[in-house]
Amino acid sequence: MENQPKLNSSKEIIAFLAERFPLCFVAEGEARPLKIGIFQDIVERIQDEECLSKTQLRSALRLYTSSWRYLYGVKEGAQRVDLDGNSCGELEAEHIEHALQQLTEAKARVQAQRAEQRAKKREAENVAAGEKNERPTAKKPAPRRRANNTEGEKRQPPRPQKRPQQARKPVAKPVQAKPIQAAPIQIVDVSSLKIGQEIKVRVGKSSVDASVLEVAKDGVRVQLPSGLAMIVRAEHLQF
């Protein structure tokens, strides 16, 4: 068997893992949650190959598990799998909550980057338009003066000058005060919640909308607008 060529990038390593372990890794589409300790399992399986180092493998796994398609797969009811596709247990609520937080923060970063790019583009367009308007226009040559009137010509009386019209002052529109949004209130007693009630789930420094599906002993089972259902502890709930 020919030696595997040296893999230079994380994307090449992920493609190699998807080809070698197709029941565990996927190159496209929603990924399945990996078994805890999958790194050591991979090292033992490919220890005779010199196509990649442990450092490269660790970086590739970090890229794979932080991708949006992997974070979408970390949801309630999903099972972790080993290299052969065997189930290794259901995901814990803490891991689901952490994945949701990472996904929310990643989307926020992308939106901020896009807004910054649009602002820079508008600024460049405004600068270009300003430079175009500031360019001096070519002056027309002054008309030649006519020769002195002959004795037989009559001088025409000067035309009366029109008064310049005063520019109308724009009427200032009243500024409407923005409504003050009330700060969210943390939920202390989950027994007061009702099925279908709209609440908020605190994720990091921000919060997302959710609706109550079930009030359990270890927390409240809620559903997010994306359809993801999860169990959340009371300290993460707000009105």
From Swiss-Prot:
Pfam family, one: ProQ_C
SMART domains: ProQ (SM00945)
Annotated gene: proQ
Identification of the protein by name: RNA chaperone ProQ
SUPFAM superfamilies to which the protein is assigned, alphabetical: FinO-like
GO cellular component terms, A-Z: cytosol
Region (Disordered): 107-177
InterPro entries linked to this entry: ProQ (IPR023529), ProQ/FinO (IPR016103), ProQ/FinO_sf (IPR036442), ProQ_C (IPR035236)
Role played: RNA chaperone with significant RNA binding, RNA strand exchange and RNA duplexing activities. May regulate ProP activity through an RNA-based, post-transcriptional mechanism.
Domain of life (superkingdom): Bacteria
Lineage: Bacteria, Pseudomonadati, Pseudomonadota, Gammaproteobacteria, Enterobacterales
Originating species: Photorhabdus laumondii subsp. laumondii (strain DSM 15139 / CIP 105565 / TT01)
Keywords: Chaperone, Cytoplasm, RNA-binding
Biased composition (Basic and acidic residues): 115-137
GO molecular function: RNA strand annealing activity; RNA strand-exchange activity
